[in-house]
A protein has these predicted regions:
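Hydrophobic pocket/interface hotspot
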Residues: 43, 55, 63, 115, ...
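Short beta-strand edge/turn micro-motifs at domain boundaries
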Residues: 130-155
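Short, low-complexity N-terminal intrinsically disordered segments enriched in polar/charged residues
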Residues: 20-53, 57
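Bacterial Sec-dependent N-terminal signal peptides
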Residues: 1-27
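Short, solvent-exposed secondary-structure junction/capping segments
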Residues: 41-45, 59-72
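A mature extracytoplasmic/lumenal domain signature
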Residues: 59-61, 69, 117-121, 150
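Surface-exposed, charged secondary-structure patches
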Residues: 79-124
Length: 155
C-alpha cells in the first residue's frame, strides 16, 4: 500500500512539474515570438520612414542581405552590404518604400529564430513587386537582431 501511494505521489509530482514547464515554455516562446516580430516590424517601419537610425538597430554587425534574382539562365543570388542597404534607404523620402508583409511561419529557439514573410512592395505608391522574405535572427545580449535576410522578387 505504501508503495502504491508513493508511486501515485511520484506520478502526480512528475505530471505537475511537466505541465508547469510546458506552460513556462509556451509563455517564453510566445514572448520571444512577439520580440522577433517586433524587430521585423521595426525594420519595415524604418524603411517606410527612411529612418536609418532605427533601421541600423534591427541588424547584427555582420548581417547578410541577399536577393534571389530569376534570370533566363537560372536563379542568381545578389549580395548587398549593410552600409549599402542603409544608404539606399536613407536616400528615399518618407513613405516612398512601402513593403507590406504578412507573417507566415515563425520558428523560435532560445538563441535563433526563422521567419518567413510573404510581401508586396510599393514604391512611391505604385506596385513594384512581390515575393518572400526569409529572416534569420539571433538573440544577442542586447536582444534579437536580424543576422540574415534573403528575398525573392516577382512582378
Amino acid at each position: 500500500m505504501k508503495k502504491s501511494i508513493l508511486y501515485i505521489i511520484c506520478i502526480l509530482f512528475t505530471t505537475q512539474t511537466t505541465l508547469i514547464a510546458q506552460t513556462s515554455n509556451s509563455v517564453t516562446s510566445a514572448s520571444s515570438e512577439k520580440e522577433v516580430k517586433q524587430v521585423i516590424q521595426n525594420m519595415f517601419h524604418a524603411m517606410l520612414q527612411a529612418d536609418t537610425t532605427l533601421l541600423r538597430t534591427c541588424f547584427s554587425d555582420k548581417v547578410i542581405f541577399q536577393t534571389i534574382v530569376n534570370k533566363p539562365e537560372g536563379a542568381m543570388v545578389n549580395t548587398m552590404s549593410i552600409n549599402d542597404f542603409i544608404q539606399s534607404i536613407g536616400k528615399q523620402l518618407p513613405n516612398a518604400l512601402d513593403e507590406r508583409i504578412e507573417f507566415g511561419s515563425i520558428q523560435v529557439d532560445p538563441l535563433m529564430a526563422t521567419v518567413w514573410t510573404p510581401y508586396t512592395f510599393y514604391f512611391k505608391g505604385q506596385f513594384s513587386h512581390k515575393g518572400i522574405n526569409s529572416f534569420q535572427l539571433v538573440k544577442f545580449k542586447e536582444g534579437w537582431k536580424i543576422q540574415y535576410l534573403i528575398d525573392t522578387r516577382y512582378k
